[in-house]
């Protein structure tokens, strides 16, 4: 044994490449025949019946007064519209049938492209089933193919865990090896800055009174008085009759 597991199934089919179908693709004679057949069948078996049915329904709705007719052309515009819608609905409803016709062609690149696209859409379920088979094969090989060297390598890769020492006494409730690494709380000595002292109403009142007294003393200070008040008055003499004169 070379130590490698072969995951390929003996009867697995190699997927064939999808042919490129572009705008410049030239269809084969068989494909042209199928195109003409699909065109005729979709017209006679789908478009004509649906167009006729839609026109009859439209005419019935107009006659009952559910749909209003044109004042000049009558019901002709609505009937033409119903016919066109029925024609395209018939063409679209025949697309699946036409695709099946192309898939049944053996030597058709277009049919091969359609088959490959359908296989790819349905491939996830098969992919998961094959994957489960591969997983079972891998587990089988791993169960029978283990060696002492592989066991030693696995032991080396596993992490080594050392037991945490616990105190032998019953009074201690925490391991001795863990408390060393517990994050300590904030130091009580390092307190926050002192909070701002609350000012009472009496203190505020005293401060206002002091400031008022200071301003009052500034007003009554002689150095601040106006010049006229500080100028000395002249002496005036008064006689016995109350008359005054200056010397």
UniProtKB/Swiss-Prot annotation:
Its main location: other. The keyword Phosphoprotein applies. Pfam families: OCIA. The modification Phosphoserine is found at residues 108, 116, 123, 193. It is found in: Endosome. Residues 217-240 have a biased composition (Basic and acidic residues). InterPro entries: OCAD1/2 (IPR040187), OCIA_dom (IPR009764). Keywords: Endosome, Phosphoprotein. Residues 1-112 form the OCIA domain. Residues 119-146 have a biased composition (Polar residues). One of its GO terms (cellular component) is endosome. Residues 113-150, 171-198, 217-247 are annotated as: Disordered. GO terms for biological process: regulation of stem cell differentiation. Belongs to the OCIAD1 family. Maintains stem cell potency. Increases STAT3 phosphorylation and controls ERK phosphorylation. May act as a scaffold, increasing STAT3 recruitment onto endosomes. The OCIA domain is necessary and sufficient for endosomal localization. Interacts with OCIAD2. Interacts with STAT3. 'Asrij' stands for 'blood' in Sanskrit as this protein is strongly expressed in blood vessels. This is OCIA domain-containing protein 1. It comes from Bos taurus (Bovine).
């Amino acid at each position: 044994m070379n130590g490698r597991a072969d995951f390929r199934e003996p009867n697995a089919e190699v997927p064939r490449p999808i042919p490129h179908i572009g705008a410049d693709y030239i269809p084969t004679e068989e494909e042209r025949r199928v195109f003409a057949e699909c065109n005729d069948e979709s017209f006679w078996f789908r478009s004509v019946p649906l167009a006729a049915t839609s026109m009859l329904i439209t005419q019935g709705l107009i006659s009952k007064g559910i749909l209003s007719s044109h004042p000049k052309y009558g019901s002709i515009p609505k009937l033409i519209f119903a016919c066109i819608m029925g024609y395209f609905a018939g063409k679209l409803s025949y697309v699946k049938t036409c695709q099946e016709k192309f898939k049944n062609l053996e030597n058709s690149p277009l049919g091969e492209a359609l088959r490959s696209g359908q296989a790819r859409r349905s491939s996830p379920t098969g992919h998961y089933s094959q994957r489960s088979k591969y997983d079972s094969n891998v587990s089988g090989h791993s169960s029978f193919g283990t060696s002492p060297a592989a066991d030693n390598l696995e032991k080396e890769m596993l992490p080594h865990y050392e037991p945490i020492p616990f105190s032998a006494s019953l009074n201690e409730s925490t391991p001795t090896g863990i408390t060393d690494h517990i994050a300590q709380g904030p130091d009580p000595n390092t307190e926050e800055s002192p909070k701002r002292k609350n000012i009472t109403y009496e203190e505020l009142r005293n401060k206002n009174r002091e400031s008022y007294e200071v301003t009052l003393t500034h007003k009554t200070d002689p150095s601040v008085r106006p010049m006229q008040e500080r100028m000395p008055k002249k002496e005036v003499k008064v006689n016995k009759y109350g008359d005054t004169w200056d010397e």
